[in-house]
């Protein structure tokens, strides 16, 4: 059987329980979506073999995660509830897809994940496994046995497992598109996370301007430095913007299973990229390109959050989003300051805010006053007819 492995308490329990108590042959796989260093991945692999897995595989999914998911979140300027860049929910889908592919490759008879019965991840993993590897047995020991953290620790200690059992004051989930932060403050409806809870501490003061270069909606350069892949640009921008404490917030959302949840997150690079990209779009896209794209992108983000990445409608929306980016090319200038940033402006050969076509609020040479009088009369003609008939029948 294949186990999606993170090296944490839940998946460590799964390995030991399934190998020692059930006698199963467990093949662990970790999908790196930007949250682990090489040394951390090596330590996780060592830990997996110590626990008793038959094989352990590390999948580097950073680039495919961007290509298949993040790219479209940027195209759509997607923020769940106008706040959250879907940092963890998008990441889980990439992980589930790769775990399913690994299970198919090994012709596994079962697939295992360490989700509890309380959150969104159980639905995302179960649903994608059911779609991609139909008929395979899905085993979820933590959920099915309703295990507490204390019970898991006691079991692993009884088996002589050595690992860090200290529960951190804050749960951290780091990835390419942001980091979630959970603690006692997020378990209630009021309260801010303290400074020490944030994984990236503020080390920069003053201000700094960065130039982001987009080509057809994708971030290709930062301050004229080119990158082989946009995921590398995201990681580089994170090192710059993260030190200003940018992209910190608390998201209140509706879970797939019907309860509301509150989670902190820091997403310096994602938030700067999304706002910069949106600013560029507002200059180069027409009114209704923006209007329809906003509607489709909102649905796309909501459906992605629900785990429905395999729905064919998502490919249809992605095709539209891709098409909309044909002219989203140019430079965006962003000023970074501690805890905030602002878009200074853009430069693009596709900028529709060209002075030769008129200046907002000023005189222009593109039309005459008589042209506007005629246009205004025709533009409101049907509404005028409606109100005329309405009044005559009262």
Indicate where each model-derived feature is located.
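Nucleotide-activated chemistry modules centered on ATP-dependent adenylation/adenylyltransferase
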Residues: 1-4, 9-394
